[in-house]
Amino acid sequence: MAGISSRIFIQATVETGEGEASVTIQDAHTHIVRITENGRTVLEEPGLAGSPEDAGEATPLIHRYTLAQLREYALTVPAGEIAFIRRAFEMNLALCQAGLDSPKTTYARYLLAENGGQLISRDERATASLLCNGAIEARVLGLPQPAMSITGSGAHGIIATMPLYAAYRVQGYPEEKLLRAAALSYLVCMYIKEYSGKLSAFCGWAIAAGTGAACGLVLLRDG
C-alpha cells in the first residue's frame, strides 16, 4: 500500500440562466484552491505542501515506531496524560443515546431490544454492537450531536472506542485500563491510516479502527 496516493482533485461547475460558477478542490477534501464566477477568479489558493506524500521520502511520524513500542507506550504513559480520552467515551455514548431517543432511527432500537432493552447488559458482544451501531446510525442520520473522531472520521472514532467501553462496563475493568486500551486503539488506527491514506479501496473504519479496537480489547484482557 506504500504507493497508494491520496492526492485529490475535484472540479465542480454549475451553470444557470444567470451565470456560471466553478469550484476546485485539491489535495484535501476541504481545501478549496480556486473559485471562479462567470470566468472571473474570486479566490485562488496554493495547494497543500509538506505532507509525506508531497515529500516523497519523509516517513510519517507514527511509522518511526514499531507496534511493540506503541503498545509499550500505552502501558506506561502516565495516566494523567491520556485522561482526555475519557471525553471520547462521553461524547460517543451521548451520540448513541441521541440515536435511541430519536424517532428517526430503526437499527439502534432493534439492537436495544436484542440487548434486553438495556444500554449495558451482561452480554458484552450485544452491548458493543448496540453502542457502536447506535452511535453510527445517529451520525449518518445527521442528528445534532457530535462524534469524537480519529484520523478525521467520526465512524473511525466510534469503532475505535465503543467496543472497549462495552467490555469495560460489562467486565468491570478499571477505568485506567480502559484509557490505556483506547490509547493503543487510537495509535493502531492512526498507524494503519498512514498507509491507506485519505482515500482507499477498503473500508477504513472496519480495517483501521476495527484493528485498533481489537488490539485495545486484547490489552484490556492483559494480552
Q: What does each model-identified segment do?
A:
Residues 1, 177-222:
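A structural-propensity feature for long, helix-poor, extended segments
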Residues 157-174, 215-222:
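Alpha-helical support elements that line or immediately flank enzyme active sites
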Residues 145-162, 204-208:
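Conserved phosphate/anionic-ligand binding catalytic regions in large, soluble enzymes, centered on
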Residues 1-13, 170-176, 182-186:
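Contiguous domain-boundary segments centered on the initiation and propagation of an alpha-helix
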Residues 8-10, 15-21, 209-223:
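C-terminal domain-closing interface element
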Residues 2-142:
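Signature of multi-pass transmembrane helix bundles
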Residues 138-149, 190-199:
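Glycine/charged-rich beta-loop-alpha catalytic/anionic-binding loops adjacent to active sites
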Residues 86, 122, 126, 158, ...:
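Conserved structured core elements
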